Amino acid sequence: MDLKDAYLSVPIHAGHSKYLRFEWESDLWEFTCLPFGLSSAPRVFTKVMKPVIGRVRSQGIRSVIYLDDMAVISPSNDQSNLDSQFVIETLQSVGFLINWEKSVLKPCKWIQFLGFTIDSSSMTVSLLQEKLNKLIERASATLHHPKRSIREVAEVIGLIVSTFPAIKLARLHYRHLEFSKVNALKENLNDFDAACSLSQEAKDELEWFSTRCYLYNGTSIKKHSSVMVLTADASQSGWGVTFEYQLTNGEWSIVEKKQHINWLELQTVLLGLQSFLSSSCGGNVIKVFCDNSTAVAYVNNMGGKIVSLNCITYSIWELCLSFDCSIEAFHVPGVQNVCADRLSRKHESSLEWKLHPTVFKWIAEHYFAPDTDLFASRLNYQVGRYVSWKPDPSAWAVDAFSVVWSDPSSG
């Protein structure tokens, strides 16, 4: 549904028209309505539309609006007709004009809206092919341009951001481009026409958009029925995770203990997923509950401005995708995150010991070289393959006594 000359339907207070004057052929003119081209006009128009759309949604009508374009979503053909009629009457009652030529008022299951294709049969939102082709071409051109400017990189980033509703993984593959742009602006005193040097990671992101983004065009808008729950919490001493009815925890290494709490919280989510995800989780949505709002934001936004946190977030999403899982994070007050909090503070320090590496190396050289460490953790294992006594991020197996050793000679 499209509004005709939408801005011009909004009158300007008589005393304020003098601020909207312009000169044309020696004559002085002033706007008596909201003009196009005014930088504040989109925000003003959006605020004017708020109570109107509020009225529509108060009737249980689901709608999506961007400035003067609106889509109405209804559960059936008949309901769609009723909802559309109510929206039209509401808009007309406050003085707006419907652009009948550009509006699609007949109920349909497939429609183009704001450069996207909404398909209620497959329940997906996809990018129009022409927009997808433009993104691929611009990404490829920028990647291979020997003297690309900061402005050119910024324009590509803008194109990428505009695809977020349709290409879900786009959020995961543009952060290093943004980092390169920001660093280049700092080095060149905000001169957008200066040359922009890209890191290898940024080039890899452009390569992804040039060659692979089309594979992920189409985001599902269907609610997932299969859900698995993970709760996570971190303290300065360790981490704790629950997954469904399973528990695990661990201590931080000396290096990890020096990290910021936001890093620890996000790392806890990664360690928990590494400990529990398996092929049986495929097709599920992993709902993560955490009492750290930064960790929640990074997971849901597929990254952020801090490089170290962005790297962990990338690992989280790559891990979930490798098991055909999706992930959503939710904030939970610390007082309600009881089990994970307790696990993050409860540690058996006496279990985290090992032979001195030099001693172990001497024994391995003079007697035998084991290929499996049977009682170890991610902090004290001595060989590449190890068995932990509880779920562990990198363990080959859990509980050495429960492993079936059918061929002792094979280790």
Provide a role label for each language-model segment.
Residues 1-12, 152-155, 230-232:
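Conserved catalytic palm subdomain of right-hand nucleotidyl-transferase polymerases, strongest
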Residues 26-48, 141, 244-267, 271, ...:
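A short, polar/acidic, helix/strand-boundary loop motif
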Residues 273-339:
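RNase H catalytic domain
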Residues 4-29, 45-55, 121, 126-130, ...:
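Reverse-transcriptase-like RNA-dependent polymerase core
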Residues 105-221, 334:
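C-terminal reverse transcriptase regions that engage the nucleic-acid substrate
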Residues 62-64, 72-141, 154, 221, ...:
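Polymerase palm active-site segment centered on the conserved acidic dipeptide of motif C
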Residues 42-90, 272-290:
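Active-site palm subdomain of RNA-directed nucleic acid polymerases
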Residues 7, 28-60, 148-172, 273:
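Conserved pre-motif C helix in the palm subdomain of viral-like polymerases
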